[in-house]
């Protein structure tokens, strides 16, 4: 029997700031190796017989998801966009309704996974999923409980009930994150598992329970999926209908109340990577228990996590620190209190700082750009345009633009003229001039853009055409 993976890639995780940002949360980060957490989540399904995954994400993350799926050859009209976040119960309902509408298998088994978890033992993971298959196929709602390795206060727990099969238990209760003494009691009892947030069930089984236990969520999601607007690789649901949907987790809405919940124990080196200290826990370390990533020199240091994006970092005689450098921010924290990084993010939000929101590298449907420098009346960006992509025709009243081609060839439209600009050549776009840029080549086009003028705001972009095949929201995101 095959599975339909449902990957939940929503959320705006702030716990790994400054690497994670609101527009680039942790599920899109590469914490180990070259692949992101999202990509690794999909890759670990290779040993299971699965259909192409369905990914559910926030609308603002759609370009990131599409690009990361394309990189691993998994982009196939399979991204459901949530216009607003409504937690996991509605998100899974959207996937279940879509699965029943579109699947060749009339009632597929949904393997629901978070995009931002790490699983180190993929063989054990696969074995647990296979073990859960028979229960899910027969109408049970299976959740995977992580066998705890220590007393942990950072996770919710699942208490197992009666044994219903070989290493499969009825769910007795879900419990909130405990204090350290209670967590110790849970660990000693052997009857409690960490709540992984991973599930396996038939699409119809989940929807039937949701309809019975949370009818408002069921009805709102049913209506939202009833007005789907396909948009290339994206599935856009009805925004107004989904806005009326209550926000609730699958645990609260369904799993805590259903009579059909089953927990399957799993020991697979699982982590939700909920903090820098937990990332240090699962990372490969040197002989002094340091995790060093980037251009780093460490002398007489131990138990540190040090990450450099583009600077040389030297450390002498320090221990138990998290040091993370990006192009626009530096974090220095004690590993024992690094969870307070959320206070930094709150500070940045209160002061309307860009550092909580996005990196200097920003992805767009046509490619990406990096902000190199900015100041009064100027902005400098390095722009990469993918082969065959373009900026739609537009103009600006208050700024001029200089384009300098570094590699590739640009087809430029300026007013009534259309001409080619090659490597080491440049062109100038005056204010109040209709212009467009296209990469007609087979390789990426890379250029430097210098904006100059009295006003550089986003509302001084007047677009004169809609990008073919894309919604208006896409054309509103050149900058």
Regions found by a protein language model. Give the residues of each.
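A residue-level structural signature of the nucleotidyltransferase/glycosyltransferase Rossmann-like core
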Residues: 110, 191, 198-199, 271, ...
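Conserved core of the sugar-phosphate nucleotidyltransferase
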Residues: 121-242, 262
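Residue-level signal for inorganic ion chemistry
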Residues: 28, 38, 95, 116, ...
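Short beta-strand segments
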Residues: 7-9, 56, 111-114, 143-147, ...
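Conserved N-terminal catalytic core of the sugar/cofactor nucleotidyltransferase
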Residues: 2-7, 14-22, 30-114, 120-124, ...
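Left-handed beta-helix
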Residues: 2, 204-404, 409-428, 435, ...
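A short, conserved beta-strand element in the Rossmann-like catalytic core
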Residues: 118-119, 427
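Noncatalytic nucleic-acid binding interfaces
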Residues: 447
């Amino acid at each position: 029997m095959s599975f339909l993976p449902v990957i939940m890639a929503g959320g705006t995780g702030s716990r790994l700031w400054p690497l994670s940002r609101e527009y680039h949360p942790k599920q899109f980060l590469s914490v180990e190796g070259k692949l992101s957490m999202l990509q690794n989540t999909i890759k670990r399904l290779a040993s299971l017989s699965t259909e192409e995954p369905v990914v559910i994400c926030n609308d603002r993350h759609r370009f990131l998801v599409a690009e990361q799926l394309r990189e691993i050859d998994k982009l196939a009209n399979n991204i459901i966009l949530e216009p607003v976040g409504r937690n996991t119960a509605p998100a899974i309902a959207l996937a279940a309704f879509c699965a029943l509408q579109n699947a060749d298998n009339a009632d597929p088994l949904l393997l629901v996974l978070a995009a931002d978890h790490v699983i180190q033992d993929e063989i054990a993971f696969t074995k647990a999923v296979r073990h859960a298959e028979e229960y899910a196929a027969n109408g049970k709602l299976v959740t995977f409980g992580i066998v705890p390795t220590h007393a942990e206060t950072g996770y919710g727990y699942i208490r197992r009930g009666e044994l219903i099969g070989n290493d499969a238990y009825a769910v007795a209760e879900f419990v909130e994150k405990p204090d350290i003494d209670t967590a110790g009691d849970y660990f000693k009892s052997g009857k409690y598992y960490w709540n992984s947030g991973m599930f396996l069930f038939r699409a119809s089984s989940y929807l039937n329970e949701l309809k019975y236990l949370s009818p408002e969520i069921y009805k709102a999601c049913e209506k939202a999926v009833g007005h789907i607007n396909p948009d290339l690789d994206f599935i856009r649901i009805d925004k107004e209908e989904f806005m009326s949907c209550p926000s609730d987790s699958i645990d609260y809405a369904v799993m805590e109340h259903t009579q059909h919940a089953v927990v399957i124990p799993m020991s697979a080196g699982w982590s939700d990577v909920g903090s820098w200290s937990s990332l240090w826990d699962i990372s490969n370390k040197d002989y002094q228990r340091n995790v060093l990533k980037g251009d780093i020199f460490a002398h007489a240091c131990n138990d540190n996590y040090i990450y450099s994006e583009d600077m040389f970092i030297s450390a002498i005689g320090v221990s138990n620190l998290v040091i993370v450098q990006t192009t626009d921010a530096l974090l220095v924290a004690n590993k024992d209190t690094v969870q307070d990084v959320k206070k930094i993010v709150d500070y940045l939000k209160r002061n309307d700082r860009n550092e909580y929101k996005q990196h200097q590298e920003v992805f767009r449907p046509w490619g990406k750009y990096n902000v190199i420098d900015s100041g009064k009346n100027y902005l400098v960006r390095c722009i990469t345009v993918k082969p065959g992509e373009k900026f739609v025709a537009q103009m600006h009243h208050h700024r001029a633009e200089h384009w300098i081609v570094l590699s590739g060839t640009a087809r430029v439209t300026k007013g009534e003229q259309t001409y080619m600009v090659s490597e080491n050549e440049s062109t100038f776009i005056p204010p109040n001039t209709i212009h467009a840029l296209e990469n007609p080549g087979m390789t990426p086009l890379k250029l430097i853009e210098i904006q100059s003028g009295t006003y550089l705001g986003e509302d001084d972009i007047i677009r004169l055409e809609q990008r073919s095949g894309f919604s208006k929201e896409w054309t509103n995101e050149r900058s």
